[in-house]
Amino acid sequence: MGDETVDGIEAKYISGLSTIMVATIQEAKDRISQIEYIFCSQLFPNFQSKSKAFEKVYSEARLAACDTWKDREKSLLDQIEELKVENQQIKSDKEKLAEELGKTASMPLRLTSLQGYIDHLKKKMKSRSKMVGDARDLYYRLVELLQVKGLDELSEDGINMIVSEVKSLKMKTEFLQEELSKKTLVTENLLKKLEYLSTEAADGERKLSSVEEEKQRLKTRLQVFEENVGRLEEILRQKTDEVEEGKTALEVLQGKLKLTEREMLNCKQKIADHEKEKTVVMGKAKDDMQGRHGSYLADLEALRCQSEEKSFELAMEIKKNKELSRTCKKWKSQHTFLCKRFNFTPDSVLHQSSLEDENKEIGQHEKSAISSYLERKHSETAEGADKVRIGTGSSGNNYEKESIIKTVQTPITSISPIVRSPGAAKPPQLSGLKRPASIWRDTRSRQSPGGHDPHDDFLDTPIENVKRVAGEEKHVHDVAKKDDSDDETQDMNPKPSPSRQRIQIAETSKKSFKHVESVRKKAERENLKGIECKQCKKFYDAVHPENEGNGNKSLRCEHHEGVSRHRYRYAPPMTPEGFWNIGFESEM
């Protein structure tokens, strides 16, 4: 016996160590996988993308800088060529101005020589005019002398000599007059030329001053261009130095990238080694765990079967409770109907109060029985779950935990609606969530001619089924509760809007009638749930009864959900039984 206890303690100790080892292996595996995931999915792609982006940006910046500096160099060379051309033009203009300046410097000498020549001509003209005057005086004197002495006193020789002298004097005077006219023309021309030369000299002086100003302006511009060229050359040298530094930085980054690639390869190798070790350890751990996993699964299967049996028994109890509440409501409705139809007596009141007391006693008895059964069931499921948890220990198997939670939660969720008393149980409401898009939206006019129409079965209504359903309807009286009166409506939407909640809170102080709001838009009506009225229920019970099988029931519900015309935003008030029966009997 002692050996068995020692073996059990050793087995428990070994199992605990094995679970701790499996947990540590699992934790190491998770950490390694997390490190691998972080490195492979975040660090290395981020670094690689950053390096590629930096290399791309650097190459683009380098190309852009090279292009810009080439453009600047080209523009500077063009400017230098333009400056050279302008310098050549300035030199040629300077030479021309020097020639013109030399000409203007020789102009005063020419003017003085011309002035002397003009004075000489004036003197000569004065002497010739004096000679002409003397000849005229002589001519006039001779004429006077001839008139005084007479022609007969003179000899022929003297007369001829005087005539010849007069002729020669006339010729001289004519010649002198011609020369005088020529000299006057020459003097006038010289004066005009002198005026023209003086104006040219003034223009030359003005041009010389303007050329000097242009020369000074061009000199200053040339100095500014030389300064700009020097500054641009300095900037070009700085940019070339920066390009060289960028090249060195790129080489350093490439070296770092190679080092990181090597480190990544080493990390991958380490990860592969860890994976191999992990697979070996996990294989051993799986071999150890598979032996115990079978027993755990068997215990869980037994516990699940037990919980299913208990849930089935509980469902049967719930069904019996519902049937009992239905019968009580049926008797109560029949009693109230008979009291209203016949005379109201105190005996009937006493009978009604006794029936109500009996119903309350039955409901309390069933409630206490169900609550005790629920406590017993919950304790059994909790003990079974504790046993399973103690057996599994800290193995870390998520699948076993999920199965235990499911087996424990199934009876609790199944018995949750039974907390209410049987007398307060309500019949299942017809309101619900938004109906899904049904395939019955396709009507006959839109179906293909070759396909089968599922609506055809609804037209084949046997008269026997109709009569049978009508006979069953006569014996069933489902009367609404006292709280669900005609002046109150039920909200079809499970989650009302805040505005409707505010309206309901405001209307609690004073009773008001909630009208049956009709929804006329097609899109809004499609979002509402179909409601089955009593006349439609007779038709569906005759065509597809509920007790013929699940297939007919689902077909009936699907057809009703798709084509029902009874759609409301709020549930309409219930009418009393036989309200619409006006007294005409029929086969139905």
From Swiss-Prot:
Its main location: nucleus. Keywords: Coiled coil, DNA damage, Nucleus. Induction: Strongly induced by ionizing radiation in a dose-dependent way. Regulated by ATM in response to DNA double strand breaks (DSBs) (at protein level). Residues 64-104, 164-281 form a coiled coil. One of its GO terms (cellular component) is nucleus. GO terms for biological process: DNA damage response; DNA repair; gamete generation; response to ionizing radiation. Residues 377-398, 417-525 are annotated as: Disordered. Basal levels in mitotically dividing cells (meristems), and high levels in endoreduplicating cells (stipules, trichomes) (at protein level). The keyword Membrane does not apply. Seems to mediate cell cycle arrest before mitosis in response to DNA damage. Is probably also involved in the transition from mitosis to endoreduplication. This is Protein gamma response 1. It comes from Arabidopsis thaliana (Mouse-ear cress). The lineage of its organism: Eukaryota, Viridiplantae, Streptophyta, Embryophyta, Tracheophyta.
